[in-house]
From Swiss-Prot:
It is found in: Cytoplasm. GO terms for molecular function: rRNA (guanine-N7-)-methyltransferase activity. Pfam families: GidB (PF02527). GO terms for cellular component: cytosol. Its EC number is 2.1.1.-. The keyword Methyltransferase applies. Belongs to the methyltransferase superfamily. RNA methyltransferase RsmG family. S-adenosyl-L-methionine binds at residues 69, 119-120, 136. This is Ribosomal RNA small subunit methyltransferase G. It comes from the Bacteria. The keyword Nuclease does not apply. Its main location: cytoplasm.
Amino acid sequence: MNKVAEIFREYGIKIDDSKTEKLDSYIDLLISAPINLTSLRDKEYAIHKHIVDIVFPVKMLTGKLLDVGTGGGIPGLILAILFPINATLVESVRKKVMWLEKILNMLNIGNVNLLCSRAEKLPADKKESFDIVTARAVSELRILLELCAPFCKVGGRLFFYKGPNWKQEYDAAHNAMKTLNVETIEIVSYTLKTGEKRVLLQFQKVGRTPDNYPRETKKILKNPL
């Protein structure tokens, strides 16, 4: 039994062996990457932090997924290994995208596309086109919403992974939710075996985003919604 499967068993997560083997290979490649994708080098802790954190609160996904600021492929690549989705991973750092290209080839992952771009620079034809938009460790919630909501279909969902201080961000994001036509579906709280408290904030897009969003980076940062 590989290490991912062993740790999944501790959480009661049931996944096909072929998928846990692929995830196990991925985490080995991630923690040994020659570029700075994670500060973690302990495999077991990295599995809790970078794989279980993504998988545990999610039951099933289908359709087209956009992962904003994917870094080393978290959460988008992990979700693409597990679920029948077509994922687009967006990352602005070219060397990270090049590393991800190698990983997709090495692990024979065919349901993932890569875009080297910032979210606010994505072409207009990407707006209102994804069933699911995800992000982890990119920015505070009201900024995340502006970066991500424009690319989600009406009726689609947005998933944001956050730590124990999420409530302050959430309370500050109500104007962003209203402006961008986003409503809360569910807030899933969970604790990793490492003791870390986590939440998955789930939103639904209930109307089209005004055409002027997302704004330029400097405007978003200087005057968040």
